[in-house]
Structures are given as C-alpha cells and as structure tokens.
C-alpha cells in the first residue's frame, strides 16, 4: 500500500493589514487545503482506496464598505473497493460523501447578521466492467444518491442586531439509477458507443408543494469512423437531465446563489444534443 498527505495554508490578510491604511488594518484573509490518500492491497484481486479533502476560505473586511465577512468550505471523502473477478471482469464499489457551505456576515451597526447555506451529498455506487474481447467492452452499474440542502438561513450576529432570524426549509432528494453501456469496434475503423441510464428521483414535499417522483431515461449513442491516425468522423446523440437548479440574483453583490433539488413545481430539465 501507499499513502499521500499534502496541505497548504495562506495568510494574505497579514500583508494587507500591514499596508498602513486605516480601513485595512482589521482585514482577515485565510485560505487552506488539505488532502490525504491511502491505498492498500488486500489480495491479488482486491485493493482498497480512501481519500479525503478539506478546504476553506475565510475573509473579513472590517470598516471597508462598513464591514463584512465571507466563508466558503468544502469537504469530501471517498472509499473505493476494486475487485478483479477474473481476467475479463472487474468491479468497483464506492461510497462518497461531500459537504459544501458558505456564510456571509454583515458587520454594520444595527444590521449585524449571519447568512448560512449548505448542502450535503451521500452516494453509493457499484460499477462492473466486462471485456470479452479486444473489440467489445460492456459496462453496467447502479447508484444511490441522497442529496440534502439547506438553501439559506439568517440570524443575529452579535448582540447589537435588529435582524429577525429566519430559516428556509431543508430540501431532500433521492436518486436511484441503473446504467448500461457498450463499446464495440468493428471493421477495424468503426466504433459504436451506446448506452442508457434510467433513474427515479424522489423529492420530498413541503408546505408549498407535494412530494413527487420522476422517472428519467438518458440514452446516448455515438458512431465514429477513423479516417486515419489524425482524423475521425463521428455522429452522436446524447440526452441528459439536470436535477439540481441554481437560483441566483445578479443584482446582489454577495454570494446569494441557492441550490435546490427538483420538486413538483421545479421539474427536471432535459437536454438533447445531436
């Protein structure tokens, strides 16, 4: 087995605060990233991989534009088991977690508040690949994805605040999917890639809308012809669905983006590409 650990930290706020300008003396800016990867050989056919990542940005600009602060952060962890069934079949089983958040702090007198938003993702995946020959490769798998987001909440930041706390309702979505794909090379210069992913999306309800379940099919196909070593001619079709929607306000000069899963009102968006 082997392992890898790395990280970095930056404090540019120290340099900014030393510039001598009164409006910059209380400035805080900190950035960090941490990575760790470990893999271990269990047997000739089995190997385990584990990786984690954590990163964050912290900024405070006191007195500048009356004072504000912003924080971003992201953390992920992945555990993957690779198993070789035989010389033609191998499988991967993965468990994945991710968490993203951001916070905005207003430091104005009388309007000191903290805005928070976060979203979490939990995934289980099983992928199987079968290569019966040098010209044929078959892939299949399943996935279970639980998505949870708290679009936003606002609360008092300190004692000198007139803000009325408010918290938006947490939204959840369950995505269960199966997929299959075939890659076939024939007549030496032709290759066909075709597959389909089918899924059911179960969205939780609220006081504004009912819980709802969507059935989605996402087929794709590509036929390519290799003209020579540097040229290829291909024709393709692809259909994909977007199950998360970002709501943003371009007129507000702060990170106001909110991610929402689909529901009975905000339906999935389908894209078809030729």
Label the predicted regions:
Residues 39-57, 71-208:
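Face-selective signature of the C-terminal outer-membrane beta-barrel domain
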Residues 101, 148-159, 202, 225, ...:
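Surface-exposed extracellular loop regions of Gram-negative outer-membrane beta-barrel proteins
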Residues 83, 222-224:
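Outer-membrane beta-barrel "beta-signal"
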Residues 26-30, 60, 69-73, 116-120, ...:
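Short sequence motifs at beta-strands and strand-loop junctions characteristic
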Residues 1-41, 49-53:
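Predominantly transmembrane beta-strands of Gram-negative outer membrane beta-barrel pores used
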Residues 20-25, 65-68, 110-113, 208-211:
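Short glycine-enriched, charge-decorated loop/helix-capping segments at active-site entrances
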Residues 8, 53-54, 143-144, 237-241:
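Short, solvent-exposed turn/loop segments enriched in Gly/Ser/Thr/Pro and often Arg
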Residues 179, 218-222:
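One-face residue pattern on beta-strands with alternating periodicity enriched for small/polar residues
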């Amino acid at each position: 087995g082997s392992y890898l650990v790395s990280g970095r930290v930056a404090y540019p706020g120290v340099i900014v605060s030393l510039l001598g300008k009164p409006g910059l003396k209380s400035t805080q800016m900190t950035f960090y990233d941490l990575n760790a990867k470990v893999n271990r050989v269990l047997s000739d056919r089995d190997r385990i991989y584990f990786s984690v990542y954590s990163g964050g940005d912290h900024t405070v600009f006191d007195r500048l534009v009356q004072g504000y602060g912003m924080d971003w952060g992201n953390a992920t962890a992945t555990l993957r088991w690779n198993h070789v069934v035989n010389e033609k079949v191998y499988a991967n089983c993965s468990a994945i977690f991710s968490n993203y958040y951001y916070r905005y702090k207003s430091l104005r007198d009388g309007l000191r508040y903290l805005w928070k938003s976060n979203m979490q993702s939990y995934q289980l995946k099983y992928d199987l690949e079968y290569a019966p020959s040098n010209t044929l490769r078959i892939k299949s798998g399943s996935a279970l994805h639980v998505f949870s987001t708290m679009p936003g909440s606002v609360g008092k930041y300190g004692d000198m605040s007139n803000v009325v706390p408010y918290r938006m309702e947490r939204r959840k979505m369950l995505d269960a999917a199966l997929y299959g794909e075939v890659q076939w090379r024939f007549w030496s210069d032709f290759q066909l890639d075709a597959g389909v992913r089918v899924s059911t999306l179960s969205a939780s309800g609220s006081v504004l809308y009912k819980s709802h379940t969507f059935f989605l099919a996402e087929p794709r196909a590509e036929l390519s012809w290799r003209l020579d070593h540097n040229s290829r001619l291909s024709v393709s079709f692809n259909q994909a669905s977007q199950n998360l929607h970002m709501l943003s306000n371009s007129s507000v000069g702060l990170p106001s983006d909110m991610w929402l899963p689909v529901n009975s009102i905000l339906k999935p968006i389908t894209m078809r590409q030729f």
